[in-house]
């Protein structure tokens, strides 16, 4: 519980959503690099690699998946994006649990971001 609480507090202090918004300057290539590479790697190593693992030490895997998915949704701030991110977080936690590696969630997250970018551009 302490680790989960500290993670939420760290997200609040960091102003993560504001930092993400400042990266999107209209430069498509910069946005693509951030969206497709940096975000999946950093977010998955934190949310699934660190937070999910710590929460699983304290609660069951389904409860840890729900908690980290909720944090993942809140991290994305916008209501619609937050709801989508919550359900995405459940899928990503499932992948982490089944494969016992953060690689699968990173690849899935990358693919989801790529699909979103393609839909936005075209």
Model features per residue range: what roles?
Residues 1-39, 53, 57:
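Juxtamembrane helix-loop-helix connectors linking adjacent transmembrane helices
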Residues 28-122:
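Transmembrane helix-loop-helix hairpins at the membrane interface
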């Amino acid at each position: 519980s302490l680790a989960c609480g500290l993670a939420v507090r760290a997200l609040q202090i960091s102003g993560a959503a504001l930092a993400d918004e400042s990266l999107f300057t209209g430069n498509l290539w910069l946005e693509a690099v951030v969206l497709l590479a940096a975000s999946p790697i950093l977010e998955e190593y934190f949310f699934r690699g660190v937070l999910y693992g710590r929460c699983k030490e304290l609660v069951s895997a389904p409860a840890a998946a729900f908690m980290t998915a909720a944090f993942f949704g809140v991290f994305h701030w916008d209501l619609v994006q937050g709801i989508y991110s919550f359900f995405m977080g459940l899928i990503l936690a499932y992948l982490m649990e089944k494969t016992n590696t953060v690689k699968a969630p990173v690849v899935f997250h990358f693919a989801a971001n790529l699909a979103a970018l393609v839909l936005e551009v075209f």
